[in-house]
Amino acid sequence: MTDRTAAATRETAETEIEVTLDLDGDGESTVDTGIGFFDHMLEAFAKHGLFDLTVRCDGDLDIDDHHTVEDIGIVLGECLADALGDKRGIVRYADRAVPLDEAVADVVVDVSGRPRFYFDGAFSQPYIGEFTSDMARHFAESLALNAGLTLHLSIEGENAHHEVEALFKALARSLDDATRVDDRRSDTPSTKGEL
């Protein structure tokens, strides 16, 4: 199997970001975004997706968390697309429902090369520490659009911490499933011959 790793950087007036990703890792992570709860979610994403992930971000948190969260989604999406290469042999489709106490998140993904994003639900509280709850949706959208994913997400619950954490874990599990190499397949999983 080819090496399915990638690294990317992004530097703007708002953020300076470095990300590395290994799709065939062990779930190890080193994350420093400046937002404690977001660090926790990215660590959970790596752990439950079995991705090795490093994220370092110096963002304009004196303003708010928007640019940091959005730009990390962009760079992680770029890394995901780069690590997948021509997508030869991948499973392509996956879905996962993950509960956390009263909350449940459903994720359906197609590693299609046709970026689309759909979200259903609302977070129960506007903030989790210094993290704006709705930025979880925005992170997933930025990831999907830059990785070339068709991504459908839905959440239900009563506690925003649980809702967001279930969402990150379901996203990780579904991406692990969809990006996994199927030994029975040597071609790209599309009748078109490419994704």
From Swiss-Prot:
GO terms for cellular component: cytoplasm. It catalyses: D-erythro-1-(imidazol-4-yl)glycerol 3-phosphate = 3-(imidazol-4-yl)-2-oxopropyl phosphate + H2O. Keywords: Amino-acid biosynthesis, Cytoplasm, Histidine biosynthesis, Lyase. It is found in: Cytoplasm. This is Imidazoleglycerol-phosphate dehydratase. It is an enzyme of class 4 (lyase). Belongs to the imidazoleglycerol-phosphate dehydratase family. Signal peptide: none annotated. Pathway: Amino-acid biosynthesis; L-histidine biosynthesis; L-histidine from 5-phospho-alpha-D-ribose 1-diphosphate: step 6/9. GO terms for molecular function: imidazoleglycerol-phosphate dehydratase activity. The keyword Lipid biosynthesis does not apply. The gene is hisB. HAMAP family: HisB. GO terms for biological process: L-histidine biosynthetic process. It comes from the Archaea. Its main location: cytoplasm. InterPro entries: IGPD_sf, ImidazoleglycerolP_deHydtase, ImidazoleglycerP_deHydtase_CS, Ribosomal_Su5_D2-typ_SF. Coiled coil: none annotated. Its EC number is 4.2.1.19. The keyword Amino-acid biosynthesis applies. Gene3D superfamilies: Imidazole glycerol phosphate dehydratase, domain 1. PROSITE patterns: IGP_DEHYDRATASE_1, IGP_DEHYDRATASE_2. It holds the Pfam family IGPD.
